[in-house]
Amino acid sequence: SPVPVWLPILAWVWTAGIAVLLLYTAVSTLRLRYKVREAVRLQGNVYQSERIGSPFVLGTLRPKIYLPYRIDIRDRQHVIAHEQAHLRRGDHLWKPLGFLLLTLHWFNPVMWLSYVLLCRDIELACDEAVIKELGCEQRADYMQALVSCSVNRRKIAACPLAFGEIGVKERVRSVMNYKKPTFWIILVAVIACI
């Protein structure tokens, strides 16, 4: 049977959508790399730059943490802990993978929602990883770092993982209401998995 006339048109539209998203990602990443090209090493894989307004992780094979020079010294340890949590969890790999899947299925609204939820859950998981090690006073400092970093975040780029990226109100609420899981909750969860 002959190929419907509209099928090649849909294929071109799908390919164009992919091209637009990949171009956006490439341009965003190149612009970010240009901004941090003169960043100064602070410690290990942590760099500071006066040309950025918000902390983030950049890179997949050799990821680096970038901090703005303007960051408050009290906020810095919390920001670094948060960004290191991203690296320990492999978020610098998971988020680009999620974006790649979104790119292939850009026409599907469920994929857009899934990507937004992935980004939110990544941030919440890193917040939880950091705050479970903190006392009440330090949690307040962490919330302050979260708010001050989000104020300086102008736009969300496709690949970098940025501290204070999304849902700050929800993240602050989550930090305030955090309780370590009890032994019984953990036991029930383990049994449910088995």
Protein language model features and the residues they cover:
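Membrane-embedded and juxtamembrane structural elements of multi-pass membrane proteins
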Residues: 1-194
